[in-house]
Amino acid sequence: MFVHPRDPFVRVNALKSSRHVRVERDGHLLAESDSPILVFETGLPTRYYLPERDVDPSLLVDSDLQTGCPYKGFASYRDVVLSGRRYPGLFWYYQAPFREVSQVKGYLAPYNERIDLIVDGRPQDRPAGPLGPRGEPGMRAA
């Protein structure tokens, strides 16, 4: 899989946190955690990586989608099925993340643009930007 070269002006940091994170879609609770890892990457919204144990496994289905990132590694995706409707690629994860973000191994990241994210009891706006308005049209590397 081809991945674009690193940009010397992009920085990626991963920090453990105790913030309370809830992930919902269409009123359904998908995940809830008090031990996320926050990933900050230049030009992108903060990503909340949640321990796999904190994501409801009964809603997840493996996806064939894979993407690459020159800063984090190669991502695999999981779709979410709610009331018979399949939502593609709502979570991604790195089986072998690069050294800079090695602590996200065993964690899943919700696609902020396509879910409802509540952090410390406060609903977060769905970001617009490089991944599309409100994240609905199309997908790009995680």
Features from the language model and the residues they span:
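Terminal leader/tail segments of proteins
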Residues: 1-142
